[in-house]
Structures are given as structure tokens and as C-alpha cells.
């Protein structure tokens, strides 16, 4: 389940991007009751993008920003409690790691759901049911 963390250069002190990625990933698993799950944990993957300020925008103007975006099966983030809790925690993680300098108003968190049956791992297309079975049996 890919996490894409996009930050304007300087939002986090150099080196804290990796810490943020790890904490955001751990929080996602925690909010879904899957911390330490042997099937899903290795499939938390992703990338960190640190961009110069002239390449990030808010209100159509250059601005320092943070974007936390997950691509997940449609059963993830389905509960309102999980949505609210994770978004609050993810925002706090970025804000805290910025030394409380980056405003929460410029931290965006969103989730994109994959089409059922189009979740590909190792060349195999899995359905939500298959993913759920794998997670439950781990």
C-alpha cells in the first residue's frame, strides 16, 4: 500500500523525512488494528519527494506544503473513526517533526482507493477479499 510523502524543501529538517515516513506508516497500521501484521507490513511501500519551494503551491502561489497520500484497497480507511484519527495523527506527526514551524493549515492528507481486483503484488492481481484473507491469516 503505497504512501507518497511530498514535502517542500525545508518543511522538515534534513533526515526527518525518513522518520516521518516510518511514523506515518506505523500510524496507518495502528489505526487499522494491523500493527505488526506479517502480511501487510511488508507491503507498506512508498516514496518521499522533497521539492524546491518554487515547485510547490497553495492558493496558486508558491508555498511550503506537505502532502500525505495513500493508495489503498477500498476496505482501508473505510471507518470514519479511522479517517478522522489517522488524519489528525498524520498532521500532528508532520507538524511536530517540523519543530512546530510548518502550519497545520498547509498539511494535506488524502486517500485514494484502488479498484477491487486491481491490487497488484508480485505480478498477481488480488481482490479485496484475497487481501483481507491474507491479512487475517498472518
Identify the residue ranges that each predicted region occupies.
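A domain-level signal for the structural core that forms small-molecule/cofactor-binding pockets
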Residues: 1-138
Amino acid at each position: 500500500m503505497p504512501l507518497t510523502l511530498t514535502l517542500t524543501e525545508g518543511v522538515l529538517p534534513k533526515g526527518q523525512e525518513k522518520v516521518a515516513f516510518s511514523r506515518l506508516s506505523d500510524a496507518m497500521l495502528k489505526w487499522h488494528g494491523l500493527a505488526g501484521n506479517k502480511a501487510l507490513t511488508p507491503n507498506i511501500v512508498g516514496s518521499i519527494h522533497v521539492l524546491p519551494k518554487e515547485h510547490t503551491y497553495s492558493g496558486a502561489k508558491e508555498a511550503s506544503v506537505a502532502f500525505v497520500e495513500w493508495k489503498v484497497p477500498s476496505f482501508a480507511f473505510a471507518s470514519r473513526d479511522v479517517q478522522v484519527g489517522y488524519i489528525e495523527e498524520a498532521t500532528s506527526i508532520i507538524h511536530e517533526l517540523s519543530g512546530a514551524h510548518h502550519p497545520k493549515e498547509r498539511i494535506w492528507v488524502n486517500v485514494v482507493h484502488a479498484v477491487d481486483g486491481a491490487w497488484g503484488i508480485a505480478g498477481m492481481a488480488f481482490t479485496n477479499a484475497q487481501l483481507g484473507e491474507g491479512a487475517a491469516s498472518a
